[in-house]
Amino acid sequence: MADPKYADLPGIARNEPDVYETSDLPEDDQAEFDAEELTSTSVEHIIVNPNAAYDKFKDKRVGTKGLDFSDRIGKTKRTGYESGEYEMLGEGLGVKETPQQKYQRLLHEVQELTTEVEKIKTTVKESATEEKLTPVVLAKQLAALKQQLVASHLEKLLGPDAAINLTDPDGALAKRLLLQLEATKNSKGTGSGGKTTSGTPPDSSLVTYELHSRPEQDKFSQAAKVAELEKRLTELEATVRCDQDAQNPLSAGLQGACLMDTVELLQAKVGALDLAVLDQVEARLQSVLGKVNEIAKHKASVEDADTQSKVHQLYETIQRWSPIAASLPELVQRLVTIKQLHEQAMQFGQLLTHLDTTQQMIACSLKDNATLLTQVQTTMCENLSTIEGNFANIDERMKKLGK
């Protein structure tokens, strides 16, 4: 109970809950504070987009199969991450590529594009009527690009004044090497004819060559030549081949045939147009025409007989249908009446079924009630016998108490 000295003080709210006010913020808002922004120029601010970073590295894994980063005590070298022949710069680094890195990147991309084109050529059937960039045209352009890259590489090896034939860079390189070897042999022969001292320095005009084999270039050139040959054969077949026309007997059998089959068919048809053969063909055609006329006459007579038989059958059917058509309205009326009778019979059958079901339910209920009544009677008899025994005991006790 509160102290009575505070009962009559002014400003006290009576019959209301106690409220304790404070100037502090709620607990949920106390943790909120503004982070101090770093304005120093020594701190690099990097804006990271988590969604873009996740999409970039999604489904990417570092292959650790066969790698060993443990410390080594023996002389055997552990296998770590191996790098390729060169390293391509990443995107957005702001570092300018050197000519060597740019050449290596272009060569790598051309090789990847060549592999993809080879896969496309095996799966996609080229069309002679398409005007878009087909795999064959793309292979030609790739061959030209690869030859340009090879040419630039050879110029770097042999010097800026090297005259390289872009159509055959490998042959031009071989010829130039042979010329240089011949010049070296000649200079060597002239030097050995005179007397040389032991202090004479070696000839500085000698050239050291490094031979680089490029089997992928030969394979690519061969594939490009085969693709060009296939394209020319396809264009030639499309030019010689004609469309299938049912009305033109000369074009029969030419659709879908290759160039050799088409030429053989055309030679056979041209041979059939010889004068000696035409007389025989005309005689055969006359005999065939006579047989065709006989067949047409016989067919007309057969068709007339067939038509007459069908007309007779139709007339007999109409004769049989006439008496049935007269009695048809009465039959329809009778069917309508029988339909109503069938509907009433169906309703009556449903009522009988419902009545039978209700009767069975009542019989079951009566049977259950009879069973319950028997149980009640048995229970009442037992209770009456028990009550009579209790009253007898009470009478005996009363008599004993009265004595």
From Swiss-Prot:
The keyword Phosphoprotein applies. Residues 1-26, 184-204 are annotated as: Disordered. The modification Phosphotyrosine is found at residues 6, 86. InterPro entries: Dynamitin. Its main location: cytoplasm. It is a peripheral membrane protein. The modification Phosphoserine is found at residues 83, 322. It is found in: Cytoplasm, Cytoskeleton, Microtubule organizing center, Centrosome; Membrane; Cytoplasm, Cytoskeleton. The keyword Zinc does not apply. One of its GO terms (biological process) is mitotic spindle organization. Residues 100-130, 216-248 form a coiled coil. Keywords: Acetylation, Coiled coil, Cytoplasm, Cytoskeleton, Dynein, Membrane, Microtubule, Phosphoprotein. Disulfide bonds: none annotated. One of its GO terms (cellular component) is microtubule. The modification Phosphothreonine is found at residues 134, 200. The modification N-acetylalanine is found at residue 2. Part of the dynactin complex that activates the molecular motor dynein for ultra-processive transport along microtubules. In the dynactin soulder domain, binds the ACTR1A filament and acts as a molecular ruler to determine the length. Modulates cytoplasmic dynein binding to an organelle, and plays a role in prometaphase chromosome alignment and spindle organization during mitosis. Involved in anchoring microtubules to centrosomes. May play a role in synapse formation during brain development. Subunit of dynactin, a multiprotein complex part of a tripartite complex with dynein and a adapter, such as BICDL1, BICD2 or HOOK3. The dynactin complex is built around ACTR1A/ACTB filament and consists of an actin-related filament composed of a shoulder domain, a pointed end and a barbed end. Its length is defined by its flexible shoulder domain. The soulder is composed of 2 DCTN1 subunits, 4 DCTN2 and 2 DCTN3. The 4 DCNT2 (via N-terminus) bind the ACTR1A filament and act as molecular rulers to determine the length. Belongs to the dynactin subunit 2 family. This is Dynactin subunit 2. It comes from Bos taurus (Bovine). The gene is DCTN2.
